[in-house]
């Protein structure tokens, strides 16, 4: 079995969709995005970021993509709600493009009734006009998340088609057998492992 995966695809999609220069620079530097985020959010030099702080920054990075709030983040990483709120605010102050994107995507979703991926797929959001506040809040989380997750899914699907076609031409004994999140698994003879 051979595998290939996209490194932090959803965060990269977020950086692109939000056109967040700080996040794009962090990815382009080749450094670990979670360590960079921890350093920026907690105001530390990169070499002083501990594994615990990196783990908290990772939870914030991915939590933002999923529309996490302070209550859920506090439970996920074992800190007070006030501390979790401080982390989220620090993150959004660091990645101002992400903060702007989050506001704009919700406003647009409320006006249009849907959000789209970069490839044009729509996710309709009737929850945004609900009289139930919890449903509206859910709709806002989905409005922030669906374009990012959906675009990442679109990219993976396109990659699957391209890998399938290329394997068919170049390595007929190799088979694309599984997709797991941002990873593709190929079964092939050992002699073809490097090419696959």
Regions found by a protein language model. Give the residues of each.
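Conserved catalytic core of nucleotide polymerization and phosphodiester-bond processing enzymes
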Residues: 1-196
């Amino acid at each position: 079995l051979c595998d290939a995966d996209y490194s932090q695809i959803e965060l990269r999609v977020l950086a692109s969709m939000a056109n967040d220069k700080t996040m794009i620079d962090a990815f382009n530097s080749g450094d670990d995005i979670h360590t960079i985020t921890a350093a920026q959010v907690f105001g530390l030099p990169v070499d002083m970021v501990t594994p615990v702080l990196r783990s908290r920054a990772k939870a914030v990075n991915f939590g933002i993509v999923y529309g996490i709030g302070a209550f859920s983040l506090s439970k996920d990483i074992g800190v007070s709600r006030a501390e979790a709120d401080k982390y989220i605010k620090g993150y959004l102050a660091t990645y101002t493009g992400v903060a702007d994107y989050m506001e704009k995507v919700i406003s647009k979703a409320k006006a249009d009734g849907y959000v789209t991926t970069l490839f044009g797929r729509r996710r309709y959001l009737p929850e945004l006009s609900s009289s139930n506040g919890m449903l509206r809040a859910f709709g806002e989380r989905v409005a922030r998340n669906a374009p990012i997750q959906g675009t990442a899914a679109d990219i993976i699907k396109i990659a699957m088609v391209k890998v399938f076609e290329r394997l068919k031409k170049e390595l007929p004994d190799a088979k694309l057998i599984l997709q797991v999140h941002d990873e593709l698994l190929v079964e092939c003879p050992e002699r073809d492992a490097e090419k696959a």
